[in-house]
Amino acid sequence: MMPLGEICFDFDRMQLVIPASYTPTPTYAPNFYRSPQRLYHLSLTDGRSGRKIDANVDTGASGTILTNRYYKKNENCFTGRTATDSLRMAGVGGVNVVKTIPVSWTFTLAGEQYTETNIPVVTSSEQNEEYDCRIGLPTLMAHRKFIINFKNMWMRFED
């Protein structure tokens, strides 16, 4: 994907667009990097803690979650809350059932604030995620467009 320079998921038209010229670089760029595991980690500001967190953009994921890594870093934010839900998560190693706490979550990306009204926070997991949040396809599709610029390493939603 990197040789393409820039791609745009246009959800209004249900198209993947590779523009002839790059979108001008915004002031917040760069806001993502490629991890040693070859994942693209997007830098978000977490509305709960106010800190920067790493999100993995996964167009194949069926939903957005806050990972066990996030939970461990922010356990004090969930004092008095009990994991009342569970989630079946499938991956290369098979299927795991993990305990979750459903929350409303606010984050800032590219200077804009967004809210997910009901996403799970994984409180126990056998996986060692390298990121705090996984952004899945439903979150991406909630916006008109999602632009990824590989040349200057930035991502953003357009509404």
Mark where each language-model region is.
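Pepsin/retropepsin-fold aspartyl endopeptidases
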Residues: 1-159
